[in-house]
């Protein structure tokens, strides 16, 4: 099924105060998440570095290290603007050429010390350039040891957020997340996914400008068809709801796992699997690529990387082990919302 994209003249116009409103929300989201994580950790506190970008803009980078729960994590807010659009944007939106741009967002990655607590990532962003604007973002979970109830809770939380705004959001954005967080050179997903969306501007279908229209996410979006009743306000409300879904989606998982005993075997496997996180972020991640292309703050861009990591040549998990279960079940796309749990 081929879905025609409406003419550019049909793009809904954002409000005149769009940039300020989104910026304020992204800052508030950073504040709320940091406060919630400090309470969850019970010991660690975030250190803040404010920075300015010579070409225009700046941000606040907050890092927590050596806490009771979090070995290292970062929550970053940024807003940047400029006249020269990066190649990654022009490739998608040639009509933005000749216009200045504005981008703002909040991103987060947490690397817990206990291998039974999953790593988690979040990012919500907004972009404007002349007649072009869009929202993007999502959240995904990367466990080291498999717990179906954790995967089900995380996915169910974000499905509920999606369903509050548009009933087909989760169906498309879950598949898009599975597609995006996939390491092609390894043939495996980065974790159990979550939701991911990009280029949402109220026109076209929900997989607007996605790279694989014939894949599962593109096909599901084609089944849904063009969504004609989404505008700037509705998409902004959706992004806000998703941002505030993170803490109730993740905190119960941490509470369940933080006191689970672990030893050197679990630690070594955690460090090995963290290598996949490094590989993805340096090879595939759009946010990393965009930040480096726009002369962003390198320390903030690379704050997603874990403090310790290791690689092992030709590693194979032991047959019948929980590590093997991770590979067999949890590093492949699954219907986690409907997964049976005890």
From Swiss-Prot:
Pfam family, one: Coprogen_oxidas
SUPFAM superfamilies associated with the record: Coproporphyrinogen III oxidase
Binding site for a divalent metal cation: 111, 121, 155, 185
ATP-binding listed as a keyword: no
InterPro entries: Coprogen_oxidase_aer, Coprogen_oxidase_aer_sf, Coprogen_oxidase_CS
Predominant place of localization: cytoplasm
Top-rank EC class of the record's enzyme: oxidoreductase
Disulfide bonding pattern of the chain: none
Record localization: Cytoplasm
Gene3D superfamilies, per the entry: Coproporphyrinogen III oxidase, aerobic
Protein name according to UniProt: Oxygen-dependent coproporphyrinogen-III oxidase
Native source species: Synechococcus sp. (strain ATCC 27144 / PCC 6301 / SAUG 1402/1) (Anacystis nidulans)
Classification of source organism: Bacteria, Bacillati, Cyanobacteriota, Cyanophyceae, Synechococcales
């Amino acid at each position: 099924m081929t879905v025609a994209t409406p003419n550019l003249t049909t793009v809904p116009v954002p409000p005149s105060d769009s940039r300020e409103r989104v910026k304020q929300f992204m800052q508030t989201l950073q504040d709320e998440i940091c406060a919630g994580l400090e309470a969850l950790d019970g010991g660690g506190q975030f250190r803040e570095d404010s920075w300015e970008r010579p070409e225009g803009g700046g941000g606040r980078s907050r890092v927590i290290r050596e806490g009771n729960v979090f070995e290292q994590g970062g929550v970053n807010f940024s807003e940047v603007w400029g006249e020269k659009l990066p190649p990654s944007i022009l490739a998608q939106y040639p009509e933005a050429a000749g216009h200045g741009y504005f981008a703002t967002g909040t991103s987060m990655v947490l690397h817990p010390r206990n291998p039974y607590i999953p790593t988690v990532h979040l990012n919500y962003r907004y972009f404007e350039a002349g007649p072009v604007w869009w929202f993007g973002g999502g959240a995904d979970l990367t466990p080291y040891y498999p717990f179906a109830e954790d995967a089900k809770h995380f996915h169910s939380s974000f499905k509920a957020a999606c369903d509050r705004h548009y009933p087909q959001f989760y169906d498309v954005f879950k598949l898009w997340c599975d597609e995006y967080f996939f390491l092609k050179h390894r043939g495996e997903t980065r974790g159990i996914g979550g939701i991911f969306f990009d280029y949402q501007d109220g026109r076209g279908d929900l997989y607007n400008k996605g790279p694989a229209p014939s894949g599962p996410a593109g096909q599901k979006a084609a089944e849904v068809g063009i969504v004609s009743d989404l505008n700037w306000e509705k998409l902004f409300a959706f992004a806000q709801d998703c941002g505030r879904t993170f803490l109730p989606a993740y905190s119960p998982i941490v509470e369940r796992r933080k006191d689970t005993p672990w030893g050197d075997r679990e630690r070594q496997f955690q460090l090995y699997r963290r290598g996949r996180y490094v590989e993805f972020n340096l090879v595939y991640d759009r946010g990393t690529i965009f930040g480096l292309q726009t002369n962003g703050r390198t320390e903030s861009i690379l704050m997603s990387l874990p403090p310790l990591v290791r690689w092992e040549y030709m590693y194979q998990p032991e047959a019948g082990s929980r590590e093997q279960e991770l590979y067999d079940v949890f590093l492949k796309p699954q219907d986690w919302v409907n997964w049976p749990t005890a």
